[in-house]
Each structure stands twice: as structure tokens, then as C-alpha cells.
Amino acid sequence: MRLRWIYIVCAMLFCACENLNYRSSVPNMPVHYTLNITREHPHFMVENGFQTIVVTSSIYEREYLGYAGLLIWTALDGQYHAADLGCPHCLKRHMPVEVDGLYAVCPICDEHYDLSYGYAIPTKGKTQEPLRKYQTILQQSATELTLRVIN
């Protein structure tokens, strides 16, 4: 009986982990971006509710923004999230998704991706594939709060 409970708990923990290594239609491009929240966007805190930042061009030489740019947001789950701006259905690099409230909307196919809890899943349209998600790492020192986005 005890072995059965250990198996069930391990299975639940394994299923609860977020898998960022899924296969996406959006081409796998390098992502390495650092956002200094303290200096550049002091309002961009998870305590302030849902907010978004769209990054379409890099400032520094060694910043990589994926396929069509980055969408970084604070979701209602109290976490920072990041995804590629490329719609997995259209794959138009020059026509990235646009933020409209709690949704990212493709201007070509009108696909709506729900950003509210960080999953970027489609809710209206033709595809069943979410936006390509990237890993976010929050780093806090005594004076600065930075968010790294990587793949």
C-alpha cells in the first residue's frame, strides 16, 4: 500500500512540471534577453496584476529575441512568462501577434491566445498549438530585480 502511494505522488509530481521542450511549429531560434525591471520597467511587478512588454528589437549586441520577437507578461498566477510573437499557425515573422487585453491576437488569422494564466493557449481560431514559450528566470539582488528570458 505504501509503495502505491509513493508511485501516485511521484506520478503527480512528474505530470505537474511544466515542459518547455515541446515541439512547436515556430522555428527554434536563439533566445537570450535580460530585462532590468528595477531600472527599465519599475512598474512591471507581478504584484501589480496583468501587464505585458513587447520586445521586437534588441538594444545590445548579444541579445537574441527568438523568431518574431518576445512577449513578456505577468499573469494572474503571479509569475513572469515569455513567449515568441510568432503565430504558430501563420508563421509570419513580419506580422507578430498583438496584445489585446488578456489575449495575444494574430493580425492575419485572428487566432486568440489566452495569456491570463501564462499558458498562451489558443481559444479562438484554427490551431490547437500554443505560442512558443520560453523560460524566465527572476534574479533579485539587494538593489536590482532582473528577469532573464532564455530557451
Show which residues each predicted segment covers.
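N-terminal pre-ligand scaffold of iron-sulfur
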Residues: 19-99, 117, 132-151
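Short metal-binding segments enriched for Cys and/or His
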Residues: 113-125, 136
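Short Cys/His-rich metal-coordination motifs, predominantly Zn2+-binding knuckles/fingers
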Residues: 89-90, 108-111
